[in-house]
A protein has these predicted regions:
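Conserved catalytic scaffold of divalent metal-dependent phosphoesterases
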Residues: 1, 44-49, 55-152
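Active-site environment of divalent metal-dependent phosphoester hydrolases
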Residues: 1-4, 25-30, 46-53, 96-101, ...
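N-terminal active-site segment of His-dependent metallophosphoesterases
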Residues: 1-34, 126-130
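A generic local structural motif
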Residues: 3-9, 27-30, 61-62, 75-76, ...
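Binuclear metal-dependent phosphoesterase catalytic core
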Residues: 5, 80-84, 160-164, 176-202
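Active-site neighborhood of phospho(di)ester-bond hydrolases with catalytic His/Asp-centered motifs
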Residues: 17-23, 40-46, 76, 133-137, ...
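Short, structured coil segments at secondary-structure junctions
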Residues: 35-37, 71, 186-187
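A short, gly/pro- and small-residue-rich
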Residues: 36-45, 152-157
Length: 202
């Protein structure tokens, strides 16, 4: 968590939208959405609990049951949404390096991304609009500052950027520990590590 985004300092920031790239406590996300009163989108990180709901379709009123995850926030993992005039897609999780939720092999991440890619292509055919923002937890493969196996990132995220050229690809997962990390480019896409926090104008 970034101390600038807590308490009275939070009142100086007037965003149109808050995006979390994962690994932030759910109660903190709930705090942000209640204080800022703007939409908050998130993807789960490898240190987050599983947000995949169990199959409850057999239950009466299943649609009215609360979903896992922070209240008032929208999980965009493997989803395409339109918020604040932006078309935003999400791909959560990190490369599997131990047993735990929200960790995937490169092959698993590729399968998850294919479903997202199909939605993106269908939307683009229907209305001609392109993707504006890709939100991931892990960085696109080869674009992280860290080179250890847990942090090299997903090939699937890089492929989504190459195919859809969003204005922005925001990721987390790689902690800079006090350093200012450079903004990178993948074609026309700005690739930004948002840890610990960033205010970004589009």
């Amino acid at each position: 968590m970034d101390e600038r985004l807590y308490g009275d300092r939070l009142g100086t920031i007037k965003p149109d939208l808050v995006v979390s790239c994962g690994d932030l406590p759910f109660d903190y996300l709930e705090y942000l959405v209640s204080r800022l009163d703007v939409p908050l989108l998130y993807v789960p990180g490898n240190h987050d609990p599983s947000v995949n709901p169990p199959d409850m379709t057999w239950m009466p009123l299943a649609a009215e049951m609360p979903r896992p995850g922070p209240e008032g926030c929208e999980n965009i993992d493997c989803r395409l949404v339109e918020v604040s005039g932006l078309r935003i897609a999400g791909l959560g999780g990190s490369l599997r390096y131990k047993q735990g939720p929200n960790q995937y092999t490169q092959a698993q991440a590729a399968r998850r991304a294919v479903r997202l890619e199909l939605r993106l292509r269908l939307k683009r055919v229907r209305d001609g609009r392109k993707l504006d923002v890709l939100v991931t937890h892990a960085p696109p493969f080869g674009m992280a500052e860290a080179k250890d196996s847990a942090h090299v990132g997903f090939v699937a995220a890089l492929r989504l950027i190459q195919h859809f050229q969003p204005l922005l690809a925001a990721h987390g997962h790689v902690h800079p520990y006090g350093r200012t990390l450079p903004e990178r480019r993948a074609g026309a896409t700005r690739v930004i590590n948002v840890v610990p926090s960033r205010v970004i104008d589009l």
